[in-house]
Amino acid sequence: MHRAMKLGTLREVLGCLLQRGLIDVGMIGGAQSDRYANINSTLIGRPNAIRRRLPGSGGANDMASHCPRLIVITHHERRRFPERCDYITSPGFLDGPGGRERAGLRKEFTVTVITDLAVMENDPETCALRILKVMPGVTIDAVRAETGFRPEVAPGVTEVDPPAPEDLRVLRDELDPARVYLKEEETLPTSRR
């Protein structure tokens, strides 16, 4: 809240701003994301056979339900991209075209999933995630090998432009000097490329 007179509570942000439609973009993470960009951050397994409990929504459901644009950031591993999430914490397109409308959620909705292998976005017609860009040195086959469903490929897939040296300096020296999120040099094992 730039130049805010007061710092809002989570309740004020979610209830007064988000649910009134005053926030355009939400950013979330999760343990699983499926073909239709549904996000699971609640449990691994089935409700009657839970293998692992996770933190839960923490406001992510509100963002996925009310923001017209959602950005999901996660590592790209096959177990994180199943055909269907074990549990839907935050709705993407639920069961495909028309799923959001049937559930009473906003129709105008776009999801972008950014991983260490690719950038995926929902196809406007099928609502399924499709590969939009790949990270430098990563192939479409490598992305598909680490995905539990077969994502389509958008026309004209290109590599993500590497960050400029000044952008890296700002990220590493000003935003994350303790290297909580960024490592000095992040590289992928060659088996994942």
Where are each of the predicted segments found?
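Conserved phosphate- and dinucleotide-binding cores of soluble alpha/beta proteins
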Residues: 1-159, 163
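A conserved C-terminal secondary-structure "cap"
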Residues: 155-193
